């Protein structure tokens, strides 16, 4: 097995972010948390992850401040895992992956859950990167600049 290298010392925001959410289990757990799952068993059933892998990934998400453990909402002795503000800020990331996956990995008419606006049940707009003035940007319209 290849040992992962930490990117915490790099100056790249993408690389640092991948330290926290760069494996598929992490994003599947976050996806499920957005869908209302809170318990270890719910995450395990939905993702199919082995208990040891799921425990490690949940601990990592807690350590990175993406999720937190709280007493169970039903008063039982269980713990719930809930998204923090940092975790909730991943909603556009998960939505972009959802839309990308729908576009490239499903055949026309192939059945899968549809992401819809809860209020009116209509499709949500495709996520776009916008300039400060509202223009739609492509990757060729952006550049990297030093801070300061």
Question: Which residues are covered by each model-predicted region?
Answer:
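N-terminal helix-turn-helix DNA-binding core of bacterial DNA-binding proteins
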Residues: 12-53
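Short histidine
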Residues: 7-8, 25-30, 40, 69, ...
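Basic, amphipathic "hinge/linker" alpha-helix immediately C-terminal to the N-terminal HTH DNA-binding motif
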Residues: 22, 73-94
């Amino acid at each position: 097995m290849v040992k992962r290298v930490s990117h915490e010392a790099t100056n790249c925001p993408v690389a640092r972010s991948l330290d926290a959410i760069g494996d598929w289990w992490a994003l599947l757990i976050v996806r499920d948390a957005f869908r209302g799952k809170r318990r270890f068993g719910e995450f395990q059933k939905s993702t199919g992850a082995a208990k040891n892998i799921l425990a490690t990934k949940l601990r990592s998400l807690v350590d990175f401040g993406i999720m937190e453990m709280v007493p169970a909402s039903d008063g039982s002795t269980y713990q719930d895992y809930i998204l923090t503000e940092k975790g909730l800020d991943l909603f556009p990331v998960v939505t972009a992956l959802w839309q990308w996956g729908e576009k490239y990995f499903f055949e026309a008419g192939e059945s899968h859950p549809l992401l819809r606006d809860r209020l009116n049940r209509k499709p949500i707009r495709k996520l776009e990167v916008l300039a400060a003035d509202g223009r739609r940007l492509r990757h060729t319209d952006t550049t990297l600049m030093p801070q300061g």
